[in-house]
């Protein structure tokens, strides 16, 4: 199929997807957030009700939890290496692409535990603020200052504190071993 993003003069936007009829069934099963605007030939037999169920936070297995911890802690060494070698873009890239991702994933599991794994925090965690304390949110935002080596060091140490606290809580609540 082909997808087009259409932006109208009034700033409304539509993601339009055109596809061969033989792909219709798979398309309807693959993405539960679609909304059918027009089915002029009546080819869709059942009502399509958009739901974000497929995007709800999922309870991690013990292995997924452990992998998240390992990825976080092991990748912080690359951030440190970049900072020590004065390779700021290398450090920022590892920080933002991996370390921050694992921190946000761990925080989302905390949210999942607190909400029964019945919601989504949105693409790129855009709704996570709604479900965490103001203190955690403010600290998380403080890790985004990346305009100097000093600020990156401070952000990294704060990420360490946040990850240790949140991952310890997640381990305790899910009865998983925290990797020391």
Region roles according to the model:
Residues 56-180:
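Conserved nucleotidyltransferase catalytic core and NTase-mimicking acidic/glycine-rich helix/loop elements
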């Amino acid at each position: 199929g082909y997808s087009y993003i259409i932006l109208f003069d009034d700033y409304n936007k539509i993601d339009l997807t055109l596809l061969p009829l033989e792909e219709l069934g798979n398309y309807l099963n693959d993405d539960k957030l679609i909304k059918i605007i027009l089915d002029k030939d009546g080819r869709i037999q059942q009502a399509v009700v958009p739901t974000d169920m497929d995007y709800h936070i999922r309870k991690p297995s013990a292995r997924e939890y452990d992998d998240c911890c390992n990825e976080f802690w092991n990748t912080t060494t690359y951030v440190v290496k970049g900072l020590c070698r004065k390779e700021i873009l290398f450090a920022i890239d590892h920080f933002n692409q991996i370390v921050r991702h694992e921190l946000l994933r761990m925080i989302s599991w905390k949210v999942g535990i607190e909400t029964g794994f019945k919601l989504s925090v949105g693409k790129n965690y855009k709704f996570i603020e709604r479900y965490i304390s103001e203190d955690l949110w403010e600290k998380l935002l403080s890790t985004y200052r990346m305009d100097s080596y000093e600020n990156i060091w401070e952000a990294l140490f704060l990420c360490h504190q946040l990850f240790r606290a949140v991952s310890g809580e997640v381990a305790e609540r899910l009865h998983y071993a925290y990797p020391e």
